[in-house]
């Protein structure tokens, strides 16, 4: 599994407290710091929990401006382009890590599952509507994959 961030703002630990283009292999052998800009929300729609103008007004995703704009962004590039991008990132990581097993792209969204203001639901919707099964990672990982 290759973790790939979709976040506008990654947590600092994801880049070992260095720049956003820094990636590294942690003590568990997991590569951290990989990103795909095809999935990163545009910064002009950065609303976050504290900045959300719709907080407590909008309780469903279809009426949230951020979610609508993010869904439009995903639809502005082809599914094939996204699959190719994820494949390229995984192939590079696979070579760097030196494993021969098939790599699986795991899109990382840093909000908790319960947070309705999260790209995770829009990413899942986009892939599922385009015939690609996309669901939440099941834990514990070792027992499920």
What are these language model-derived features?
Residues 1-145:
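Residues lining hydrophobic/aromatic ligand-binding pockets adjacent to catalytic sites
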């Amino acid at each position: 599994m290759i973790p790939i961030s979709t976040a506008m703002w990654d947590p600092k630990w994801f880049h070992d407290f260095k720049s956003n283009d820094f990636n590294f292999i942690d003590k568990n052998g997991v590569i951290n710091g990989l990103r795909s800009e095809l999935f990163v929300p545009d910064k002009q729609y950065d609303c976050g929990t504290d900045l959300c103008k719709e907080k407590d007004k909008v309780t469903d995703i279809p009426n949230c401006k951020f979610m609508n704009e993010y869904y439009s962004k995903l639809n502005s590039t082809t599914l094939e382009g996204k699959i190719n991008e994820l494949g390229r990132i995984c192939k590079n990581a696979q070579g760097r890590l030196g494993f021969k097993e098939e790599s699986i792209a795991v899109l990382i969204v840093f909000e908790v599952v319960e947070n309705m203001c999260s790209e995770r639901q829009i990413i899942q919707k986009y892939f599922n509507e385009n015939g690609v099964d996309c669901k939440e990672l099941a834990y514990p990982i070792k027992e499920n994959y």
